[in-house]
Amino acid sequence: MRINPTTSXPGVSTLEEKTLGRITQIIGPVLDVAFPPGKMPNINNSLXVKGRDTVGQQINVTCXVQQLLGNNRVRAVAMSATDGLMRGMEVIDTGAPLSVPVGGSTLGRIFNVLGEPVDNLGPVDTRTTSPIHRSAPAFIQLDTKLSIFETGIKVVDLLAPYRRGGKIGLFGGAGVGKTVLIMELINNIAKAHGGVSVFGGVGERTREGNDLYMEMKESGVINEQNIAESKVALVYGQMNEPPGARMRVGLTALTMAEYFRDVNEQDVLLFIDNISRFVQAGSEVSALLGRMPSAVGYQPTLSTEMGSLQERITSTKEGSITSIQAVYVPADDLTDPAPATTFAHLDATTVLSRGLAAKGIYPAVDPLDSTSTMLQPRIVGEEHYETAQRVKQTSQRYKELQDIIAILGLDELSEEDRLTVARARKIERFLSQPFFVAEVFTGSPGKYVGLAETIRGFQLILSGELDGLPEQAFYLVGNIDEATAKAMNLEVESKLKK
């Protein structure tokens, strides 16, 4: 991180110290640039191309140096369209990697990969900037304590708890509630932990990015009246951007998150949607640079690129970055190099199920498919572990019995199995929860449920103490006391109807 001086020293031009080169070749988003002998830029240095095209329009393209070719030439990848560039144009070596604004001024705003605001809300304070290429924290700075990151969402905290400073893979198709879950996590971390969030849209559809922004404004995650009160910064590199931009936009978002962790000493939530598109962009860049492809056509540097991003996402003694990454699995093949490389870095997986979403169970997190390395008795404690295992066993037994129920009906089951089914259906409904950010749609006030309350609720259902309550009493409530109160209300309503 560096503080930019507000003014230059009198009479000193910043360009006088810069090295000038010239474009010698343009192949799509890749430029070859020749520099004077002994004035070669370093790898990852940012180069600026400024000039006018054939019709006199201003061109301003930023590139990042990727290869040193010899004969005083470098190969750079452009971060924006190269339309209008010509051989012989002047290129300025900025002498440093790409730097982006960081700090409180980024909250509530939308940025591109270069750290430029793209939301038409005016300029951003750029006095504090940070380079996007940095090394991961040293071992001595890391926080080795294994601690749970409480989200206030029952199904996540009980069955697939997140690790503070961990990495979570979010698997979900279109329309199963991925965006709403992301927004609720952003909202809850801000309220419960006083933390902030950074959202990196890597290869996002522009429409989806716009929808997310609008929904965040509606739900109050972004405060339009007082933008500084917002809880999230957004960084987008859309699908129509060159691969260089899509490959680096994750680093821009991560750099903003690192500032909140290291300087403001906060717990930060970092969303990357979609980590597979980061890999895809890297593959395109690799091919453009002339590297030999590796397995399934991916870049040979896949593990290194993934590691350089993932290793920076960690807990230090100052604060933590907990990352939630959407993972696209090509053709549902988990052995594909892109998801396989991602899995090596994940601490937990949250799988969203279309079947649950169709039933109206939101969040539609699958209790059997979602996993976490944190769900161990020595980390979460015996009580939490036992409760989670019993919930999973009951849900699994219900899943096994569903075919029998569909063919023969409930009456053909044994007394024990009927009891299991009744409790499993209550558990399934109790795993749903009203969200703060969905209040507008559901009409129910949102609920944050602490871990102790969550465990107590499921223990009461499993013990049979609540067998007499109707199933619908457990649907879309917070803690178990609300379910009991709802059951009483339902009873009163049914008596009044009679």
Swiss-Prot record:
Keywords: ATP synthesis, ATP-binding, CF(1), Chloroplast, Hydrogen ion transport, Ion transport, Membrane, Nucleotide-binding, Plastid, Thylakoid, Translocase, Transport
Cellular component aspect of the GO annotation: chloroplast thylakoid membrane; mitochondrion; proton-transporting ATP synthase complex
Record-level Gene Ontology MF annotations: ATP binding; ATP hydrolysis activity; proton-transporting ATP synthase activity, rotational mechanism
Function noted in UniProt: Produces ATP from ADP in the presence of a proton gradient across the membrane. The catalytic sites are hosted primarily by the beta subunits.
Amino-acid positions noted as binding ATP in the UniProt annotation, renumbered to this chain: 172-179
GO BP of this protein: proton motive force-driven mitochondrial ATP synthesis
InterPro entries reported for this sequence: AAA+_ATPase, ATP-synt_VA_C, ATP_synth_F1_bsu, ATPase_a/bsu_AS, ATPase_alpha/beta_chains, ATPase_F1/V1/A1_a/bsu_N, ATPase_F1/V1/A1_a/bsu_N_sf, ATPase_F1/V1/A1_a/bsu_nucl-bd
CDD domains per record: ATP-synt_F1_beta_C (cd18110), ATP-synt_F1_beta_N (cd18115), F1-ATPase_beta_CD (cd01133)
Enzyme class: translocase
SUPFAM superfamilies: C-terminal domain of alpha and beta subunits of F1 ATP synthase, N-terminal domain of alpha and beta subunits of F1 ATP synthase, P-loop containing nucleoside triphosphate hydrolases
Protein family (similarity comment): Belongs to the ATPase alpha/beta chains family.
Pfam family, one: ATP-synt_ab_N
Species this protein is from: Schisandra sphenanthera (Southern magnolia vine)
Localization in the cell: Plastid, Chloroplast thylakoid membrane
Catalytic reaction(s) noted: ATP + H2O + 4 H(+)(in) = ADP + phosphate + 5 H(+)(out)
Subunit structure: F-type ATPases have 2 components, CF(1) - the catalytic core - and CF(0) - the membrane proton channel. CF(1) has five subunits: alpha(3), beta(3), gamma(1), delta(1), epsilon(1). CF(0) has four main subunits: a(1), b(1), b'(1) and c(9-12).
Name used for this protein in its record: ATP synthase subunit beta, chloroplastic
